[in-house]
Amino acid sequence: FFNLTEDNIYKSAVIKDIDSNIGQLLKTDAKFYAIHVSPSEKELRAMGNTEQEQAEAMKHYIREVFVPEYAKNFNKGLSEADIKFYGKIHFDRNGSDNELNMHCHLIVSRKDQTNKKKLSPLTNHKNTQKGTVTSGFDRVNLFQQAEQGFDKLFDYHRQQSESFDYHNTIKNGSIF
């Protein structure tokens, strides 16, 4: 596993760290969220020519783009350093005929690094200012920002038909 600053972290250390970062969570609360980062074959080619190059590029993307954007989308003034996460890169996908299949599984703690703030990317609140829940999480914005960050980091020239906005519009209708 890897996190923001380290590589080659043992599975037992990951389990212990996530399991101990649960202060004030209810028994019904999730201890962590599993996030899957799965580039297309074209995106993988932009990340490097070998599996090793692609894996290093994926770690760089997770650390420099995805986790910082994830943190920002809580609208709580968080940075990537506040997010407790571990990533594991895989090169195979069951049921896939693609030549390139690298993807990354992220385990993200429900609590921040200090074990004080509850974080949920599944909340439906978006940047609310009043009521019980202030802040929220904007999943659409996360996908847009992560995609733009990918394109900039790897100098990737995305076709409109490959974009999140395009697929989201096809799936859900109107762009407004």
PLM segments and residue spans:
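N-terminal nicking endonuclease/strand-transfer module with a His-rich metal-binding environment
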Residues: 1-176
